[in-house]
Amino acid sequence: MEASVSLKKVGKVLNGRSVLAGLSFGIERGSIMAVVGPNDSGKSALLKTIAGFSKPEYGSVFIDGKDVQLRRIETASVVGYMPQRANFDSQLTIFENLQFHGRLYLMAPQLLNSRIASLSDRLGFREFIHDFPHTLSSGYQKRALLGRTFLPDPHVLLIEEPTASLDLRAQYEVWDFLQEMRGSKTIIYTTQSIREAERVHDRLVIMDHGKVALDGKLDRLLENAGELFHFQIHFKKLSKELYDNMSKVTTVVSPSQVGEVFDFYAREREVFFDIMKLAIQEELVDYAADKVGLETLIMTSTEEPIR
């Protein structure tokens, strides 16, 4: 399928630190790509660079085959960008903010009013449409912000943390809304929510230190990871000697100690019983065993966990 957005060896440096490290990939038209990773992994920098707000030190970004930096006006007209934090004009009501935004895109008055009505209904902020932004909760500001992003009907959407500050019911409403756009819009969004990334994506990108650590559909990434299990054994007292002995077992992967808990990964369930034999004389508080999921994939492919 044709790529709607393409990156060619894109690199970005901020304060002497590489935040995007030579990224090259294409994003299929009409698909949804979720970008996850620890803080400062490059997620926000990626969206700002695709939008054209941040110029890369090297490389190029293309939207519909047009260079974002060289053909700024043409590409900006087809891109909607939603920042993580609301940036409404505090002197205008939500309705006036949306009106102003639509006029920037030269929307006809009748179409503009129709779009405002339908989006405010669909995203659940119509009853607050004539209120000032600061009087709304952060959740309703987020809904209105999403409505503003979709208002001029752009076909490329770049969204930072679409459901941050929303309650669970509102999260599901936004997820359903985004999935309704599949096929007609190319959506790239960043998130700290494991549940969100698992639920809403055609493609999942895990970033770490400006690089793509993993890229693909979740079930394929899990399949490629093979059988991987995460174990946690909570002892009443975990001595250094016991920790060292358990860590030396060759089938134990990435062992660590968190308080009195021995945390490790393994390719086979039987490794858990091998470890328990070493600790048979010790008093246990609890234990847990889980097959690898997205959260574990992120932890094992990045240097820091998502917080």
Regions found by a protein language model. Give the residues of each.
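Conserved ABC ATPase "signature" region
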Residues: 99, 103, 110-128
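A short, proline-enriched helix->beta-strand linker immediately N-terminal to the Walker B motif
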Residues: 151-155
